Amino acid sequence: MTIFSDIGRYLLMIKGMFSRPENAKMYWKEFIHQCTEIGFGSLGIVAIISVFIGAVSTVQTAYQLVSPLIPPSTIGQIVRDTVILEFAPTLVCIVLAGVAGSRIASELGNMRVSEQIDALEIMGINTKTYLILPKIVASLLMIPMLVALAMALGIWGGRLAATASGILSGSTYDKGLLEFFVPFNVIFALIKAYVFSFIISSVPAFYGYYVKGGALEIGRASTKAVVVSCILILFADYVLSALLLPSAQ
């Protein structure tokens, strides 16, 4: 019954967030702060991962395409679609679940254990709206931007690896990028990014907000939040792919 009670408390938490703010200016400052923490705080790791994802994709694709009947520009097509459809949204969001998700869970957990949340509630502040909603809205704004950046850097990293290792020329790689391009793939990746960003922010917020105990329980809640977020991301990835990709229907 624990899982059903957790789902119920999670839904009640989401419902409790949507109330009229007591001080809109205070909420705006918290929203900007969360945008800085989630967006710019994760920019470095996202950039590094994206470049190497594209580079590894290019090298491994070239290793497998050994048939002389397949034009070299196909490498660019495969890297483009792989990065846009799967690597950029899914892998980057799994990393962000560990980076941003653990921070959200530990921050709220520390506030709960130190009774800061109780103090805010005594002051008449809706802590769900003030502490959780800005994190979710900031994630919905910043994480899709990070995913879009990851797409561009992943494709650029693949081009860099292709030219540096002599697999194929830059013009051949660019030709492959333009061949059989499906714009819906980008839209699909951004849809996944929005769904994943809600999971990354709301699930750790739930585990951090309702933590009980001391420092040990905060660590356990952060770990559980990251694990559950990653599982939900992979499950949502499959569901969205089965529902939205034309070939899967």
Q: What do the PLM-derived regions correspond to, one by one?
A:
Residues L108-L133, A215-I218:
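Short cytoplasmic-facing helical segments at TM-TM junctions of multi-pass membrane proteins
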Residues Q60-I84, A152-Y194, S202-S222, L244-Q249:
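Membrane-interfacial helix-loop-helix connectors in multipass membrane proteins
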Residues E115, T127-V147, A221, A225:
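Start (N-cap) of specific transmembrane helices in multi-pass transporter permeases
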Residues I45-A62, V239:
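Hydrophobic alpha-helical transmembrane segments of multi-pass membrane transport/permease proteins
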Residues I45, P72-I104, A138-V147, F180-F196:
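Loop-to-helix entry region at the N-terminal start of transmembrane alpha-helices
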Residues M1-K29, Y207, K212:
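Short, membrane-interfacial amphipathic segments enriched in basic
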Residues E22-I48, V227-C230:
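Membrane-interface helix starts
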Residues I49-F52, V92-A97, L133-A162, V203, ...:
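Hydrophobic alpha-helical transmembrane segments that constitute the membrane-spanning cores
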